[in-house]
């Protein structure tokens, strides 16, 4: 009996992992403009995509969450070729977050302070589900979130680890931790 239960649980885990790998989120298709774009640091192409969203007028403001506290705004602007005027008006560097859960908390505070009603979440495809899930738990219901995944070529180990982080995040959400 226990062997059957464990076999079923293992099968569910395998099917879930295969779904996770095969059905990675994609870039937002023809989504309209939002009040803001949110970019958690940590993956290649995220900040560039966020700046592209700003430059094309799909968002008015951008929060880059989880920036290393030692990074100065001028250094950020130089590295990503952001004009000083755009840094001043439109780009906020968030230094409080250290992980996906604290990215969501930092984002929720920034959203409230800036009266954001719609946002575009830009993160790597393999990270999108967990980042969006954490964000959904912290944002008010009236805030619309568009998921805009940055395509990547993740290694097996990255996918394996992220799948388990997603499971842990969902379990924590069920337990309301």
Which residues are covered by each model-predicted region?
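Hydrophobic membrane-insertion alpha-helices, especially the h-region
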Residues: 3-20
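A structural signal for short, hydrophobic/glycine-enriched beta-strand patches
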Residues: 22-160
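A transmembrane-helix-recognition feature enriched in membrane-embedded lipid enzymes
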Residues: 158-177
């Amino acid at each position: 009996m226990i062997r059957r239960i464990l076999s079923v649980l293992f099968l569910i885990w395998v099917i879930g992992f295969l779904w996770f790998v095969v059905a990675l989120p994609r870039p937002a298709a023809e989504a309209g403009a939002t009040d803001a774009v949110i970019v958690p640091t940590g993956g290649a192409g995220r900040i560039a995509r966020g700046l592209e969203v700003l430059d094309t007028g799909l968002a008015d403001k951008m929060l880059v969450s989880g920036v290393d506290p030692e990074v100065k705004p001028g250094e950020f602007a130089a590295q990503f070729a952001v004009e000083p005027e755009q840094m001043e008006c439109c780009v906020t560097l968030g230094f409080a977050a250290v992980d996906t859960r604290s990215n969501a908390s930092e984002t929720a505070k920034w959203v409230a302070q800036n009266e954001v009603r719609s946002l575009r979440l830009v993160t790597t495809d393999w990270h999108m589900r967990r980042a969006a899930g954490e964000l959904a738990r912290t944002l008010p219901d009236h805030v619309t979130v568009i998921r805009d995944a940055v395509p990547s070529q993740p290694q097996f180990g990255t996918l394996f680890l992220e799948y388990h982080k997603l499971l842990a995040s969902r379990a924590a959400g069920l337990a309301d931790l």
